[in-house]
Amino acid sequence: MIIRSKAPLRLGLAGGGTDVSPYSEIFGGAVLNATINLYAYATIIPGGDKTLFRAEDKNEAMEIASETVHGSTGSFSIAKGVYDRVISEFGLKPAPFSLTTYVDAPAGSGLGSSSTLAVAVLGAFAEWFRLPLGEYDIARLAWDIERNDLGMAGGKQDQYAATFGGFNFMEFSGNGKV
């Protein structure tokens, strides 16, 4: 079995930065964005005796024993962070697999590539483990993994744009509601 997932990168059109804490909690925020025909891809092949992370766009790979995936640092922090959270949140037993990712634009490009990668990887794991996650669940969980588990800075528009795609107007309120 091969599981494939992809999520679109986004172009911010207006309101960028108003989705970032603490601004959005104090004043609220609103953004306008559109997804474009550039993507983050994730492919999972279950099985084997070790876990392999491969980032084709960075020409990097890391092989580890399945029970030692925990610890989310370096080039594979997003992929490992998503896996760690999925295993712990849904009470799953770690299993060996190969995860290959590719992003059409590098981190720091301003297109939400890191968050889009988180959404694509989460989508692939959700499919593999048949997790009961809807679109809002995926966007919220991807945001929580990046901001709280991994300590990455940023707002919320990237995860929601990558999950829903298309042309988006989003409002953010002090209670965390999108």
Model-derived regions, located:
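ATP-dependent small-molecule kinase catalytic core of the GHMP/sugar-kinase superfamily
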Residues: 2-8, 14-29, 52, 61-63, ...
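Anion-binding (especially nucleotide phosphate/pyrophosphate-binding) glycine-rich loop
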Residues: 3, 37-144
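Short, solvent-exposed loop/turn segments at the edges of secondary structure
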Residues: 36-37, 164
